[in-house]
């Protein structure tokens, strides 16, 4: 096996998806703990030793305690290299989250055992389904009261339309939580609560049909055996091929806070989740084992280093190897760049990188030339597909408090739009600036970042826009007619694309009927 093939085979790149408060930040920290990447989970101290969770780094996140921005963490585990992408868990999240899911090969779904499947989980699963992403499931919070586990599995199947195959099964919950039973291996993993940074030695009872198991379960033993027979009769057996096709999810139970069960999930990612997969470009399919370097940018983030107004472009390597000082072709702008200072990530600890392989995520310093969706190669003209822009669902007009700062406002919004924090529209008929977002929190994020990073204070006003659609039309004459007729509602977005801002759903339907030659698109690929 070549070094390259061996390095690719070691990689596992996955994201965590969940509804807010299902325990995603806690599980992220416990995973880092498994990889010995942090000594004390959740209390990585900065110099001032103020304690805040490792993966939530922007000012606003610190105040609200939610991971607004996607961070990337790399750590070793069992001779493998794990790349973990954290997605914003707040109900108000942006396209950032969707795009992060285009950069991974599998996902870990975290469900709150007391609540089951929640709306955000459904939305994220829809995105995973588009790409048949393999999903490992973790039902969390067994140290509290949870719903009937069989009911939870039924709900996963009915609502998320994926077969659920339990790998472990909980023995009791809350104060009666005794551990989990591993169905295939016929053994009990005993629950010993371990908080924070403690890595507890696990106690295992081999065989359910044993005196030791009877003693541990006590009065619960007979009921548990009966429940297990029911489960084994009713549930799917795990089928790795169905998992890799995105049709079945292995389900684990545990408590991230109690530091129990997280290792079972990480083992599943290593043992079953795919190594870096081939990627589709417009021109051809790119295999990870190819010698030549290729990669695409799925996210841009400003100011990871408060001392520098820098912006980092996050790139997923699709093939070949990154080496410090190598030359790359930036395909969209047809320029060669020498990259000497790519970064690897351990949350906000950033280190310079000597080499990286397919499946890894690296950070490039961006001085305004890199956009989301850009492809980098060693010279070949390629464009990776499937990195979408979604039509925003909420709109506000921006009002400047100091009219002399309109230049800074435009620059700030342009940069925040390139980063994917918001979408910006400039109407044809006036000098308004309209912001579009997927969730309300995005407007707060933009206002606070304009103030902190660009020293611009702005206010928002309601505006009569229901939705935005990107316009495409191959017939020049028809397009001109359309532009003349629809002038009042036309705008140009931050990337220079013609956009129709529909005041109502009815208006949009009428326009689509009236102009069959014009395509009104709700998503747009990054080009």
Swiss-Prot record:
Positions annotated to bind GTP: 18-25, 86-90, 140-143
Superkingdom to which the source organism belongs: Bacteria
Coiled-coil ranges per UniProt: none
A GO CC annotation given for this chain: cytosol
Gene Ontology terms describing biological process: regulation of translational termination
CDD domains in the record: RF3, RF3_II, RF3_III
Record carries keyword Coiled coil: no
InterPro entries: EF-G-like_DII, EFG_III/V, G_TR_CS, P-loop_NTPase, PrfC, RF3_C, RF3_dom_3_sf, RF3_GTP-bd
Keywords assigned: Cytoplasm, GTP-binding, Nucleotide-binding, Protein biosynthesis
Name of one Pfam family that matches: RF3_C
Compartments it resides in: Cytoplasm
A single MF term (Gene Ontology): guanosine tetraphosphate binding
Function of the molecule: Increases the formation of ribosomal termination complexes and stimulates activities of RF-1 and RF-2. It binds guanine nucleotides and has strong preference for UGA stop codons. It may interact directly with the ribosome. The stimulation of RF-1 and RF-2 is significantly reduced by GTP and GDP, but not by GMP.
Family stated for the protein in its record: Belongs to the TRAFAC class translation factor GTPase superfamily. Classic translation factor GTPase family. PrfC subfamily.
Protein name: Peptide chain release factor 3
The organism of origin for this protein: Stutzerimonas stutzeri (strain A1501) (Pseudomonas stutzeri)
Gene behind this protein: prfC
């Amino acid at each position: 096996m070549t070094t390259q093939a061996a390095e690719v085979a070691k990689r596992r790149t996955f994201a965590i998806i969940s509804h807010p408060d299902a325990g995603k930040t806690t599980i992220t920290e416990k995973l880092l703990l498994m990889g010995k990447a942090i000594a004390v989970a959740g209390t990585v101290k900065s110099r001032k030793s103020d304690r805040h969770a490792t993966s939530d780094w922007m000012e606003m996140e610190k105040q609200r305690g939610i991971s607004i921005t996607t961070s990337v963490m790399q750590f070793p585990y069992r001779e493998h290299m794990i790349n973990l992408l954290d997605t914003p868990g707040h109900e108000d999240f942006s396209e950032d989250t969707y795009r992060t899911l285009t950069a991974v090969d599998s996902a870990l779904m975290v469900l709150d055992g007391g609540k089951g499947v929640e709306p955000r989980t459904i939305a994220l699963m829809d995105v995973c389904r588009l790409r048949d992403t393999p999903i490992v499931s973790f039902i969390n919070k067994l140290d509290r009261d949870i719903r009937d586990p069989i009911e939870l599995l039924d709900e996963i199947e009915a609502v998320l339309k994926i077969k659920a195959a339990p790998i472990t099964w909980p023995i009791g919950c809350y104060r009666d939580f005794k551990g989990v039973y591993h169905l295939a291996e016929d053994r009990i993993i005993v629950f010993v609560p371990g908080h924070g940074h403690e890595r507890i030695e696990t106690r295992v009872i081999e065989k359910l049909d044993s005196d030791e198991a009877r003693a541990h379960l006590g009065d619960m033993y007979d009921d548990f055996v009966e429940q297990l027979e029911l489960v084994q009769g009713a549930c799917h057996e795990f089928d790795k091929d169905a998992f890799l096709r995105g049709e079945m999810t292995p389900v684990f139970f545990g408590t991230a806070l109690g530091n129990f069960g997280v290792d079972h999930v990480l083992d599943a990612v290593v043992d079953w989740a795919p190594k870096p997969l081939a990627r589709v470009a417009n021109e051809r399919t790119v295999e990870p084992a190819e010698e030549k370097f290729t990669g695409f940018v799925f996210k841009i983030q400003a100011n990871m280093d408060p001392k520098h107004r820098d912006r980092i472009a996050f790139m997923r390597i699709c093939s070949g190897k990154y080496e410090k000082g190598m030359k790359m072709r930036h395909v969209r702008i047809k320029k060669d760049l020498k990259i000497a200072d790519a970064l690897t990530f351990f949350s906000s600890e950033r280190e310079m990188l000597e080499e990286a392989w397919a499946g890894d995520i690296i950070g490039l310093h961006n001085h305004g030339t890199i956009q989301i969706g850009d492809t980098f190669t060693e010279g070949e003209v390629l464009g990776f597909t499937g990195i979408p822009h979604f039509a925003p669902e909420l709109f506000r007009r921006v009002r400047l408090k100091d009219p002399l700062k309109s230049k800074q406002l435009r620059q700030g919004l342009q940069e925040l739009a390139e980063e994917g924090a918001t979408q910006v529209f400039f109407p044809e008929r006036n000098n308004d600036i309209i912001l579009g977002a997927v969730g309300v929190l995005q407007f707060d994020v933009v206002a606070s970042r304009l103030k902190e990073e660009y020293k611009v204070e702005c206010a928002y006003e309601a505006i009569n826009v229901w939705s935005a659609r990107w316009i495409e039309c191959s017939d020049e004459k028809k397009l001109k007619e359309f532009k003349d007729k629809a002038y009042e509602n036309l705008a140009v977005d931050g990337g220079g694309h013609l956009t129709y801002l529909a005041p109502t759903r009815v208006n949009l339907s009428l326009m689509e009927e009236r102009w069959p030659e014009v395509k009104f698109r709700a998503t747009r690929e990054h080009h």
